[in-house]
Amino acid sequence: MSALPNYFRITALLRTQRYGLAIGLLFMAPSVWAQLPGIVTQPLPNGGQSWTLSVQTLVLLTSLTFLPAALLMMTSFTRIIIVLSLLRNALGTPTAPPNQVLLGLTLFLTFFVMSPVLNRVYDEAYLPFSQDQISMEVAIERGAEPVREFMLRQTRETDLALFTRLAEIPEIQGPEAVPMRVLLPAFVTSELKTAFQIGFTVFIPFLIIDLVVASVLMALGMMMVPPATISLPFKLMLFVLVDGWQLLLGSLAQSFYS
């Protein structure tokens, strides 16, 4: 019983020390606060200004939170992951390949497709910025240009016209004048449409196998046997015989360059 008052006494002492520390920091001398590093800008040789390293680090860490959305919405990731998911459903193997393998394959194929764009971003934006030749604002503009060109090549004109009309933009003078708020949803819509078109083409041969197997089982009176169990080996054999992985992944990569 004697330990209980000691516990409350220690808790009250710690609480008092915390309050005292907070009050001390509040009334700290202004000279102490002045010694802390501030957020300033640095002049560049060409007359521009650049932020201090602390602000650059803060901007970088903040931009990392948007990296998944940028990877999903502004690259080839969306088309590839949808086609591979539809292929898995068409084969009738919902757990093979596993999600981790599917995501890893999609990421590596995305980096392969986007490597020319990433090389341009590195050469035209990051390298001059790291050598203090350009400011961060100019680096962002130069880095966004290759991504814009990639997105414009993959976007249908009908989708651009739709979102231009919804944004109430009167007239766009050339592709370089398309604003990002119009280009992003138009690009995603085009990618979804293209992915489902490729998925439909992938589904057709496996659907034919399912129909043939189901018809044979009904003709033999084996209606209690699930057709998916019988058709799975035939679908796997067909996919292996035509070298399906090479055909599909090669076609996916080529679809971004045609």
UniProtKB/Swiss-Prot annotation:
Residues spanning the membrane: 20-40, 64-87, 98-118, 194-213, 220-242
GO cellular component: bacterial-type flagellum basal body; plasma membrane
Main location: membrane
Topology versus the membrane: Multi-pass membrane protein
Domain of life the protein comes from: Bacteria
Gene Ontology biological process terms, A to Z: bacterial-type flagellum organization; protein secretion
Locations listed in the record: Cell membrane; Bacterial flagellum basal body
Disulphide bridges: none
Keywords, in A-Z order: Bacterial flagellum, Bacterial flagellum biogenesis, Bacterial flagellum protein export, Cell membrane, Membrane, Protein transport, Transmembrane, Transmembrane helix, Transport
Biological function: Plays a role in the flagellum-specific transport system.
Family of this protein: Belongs to the FliP/MopC/SpaP family.
Protein name: Flagellar biosynthetic protein FliP
Source organism of this protein record: Pectobacterium carotovorum subsp. carotovorum
Lineage summary: Bacteria, Pseudomonadati, Pseudomonadota, Gammaproteobacteria, Enterobacterales
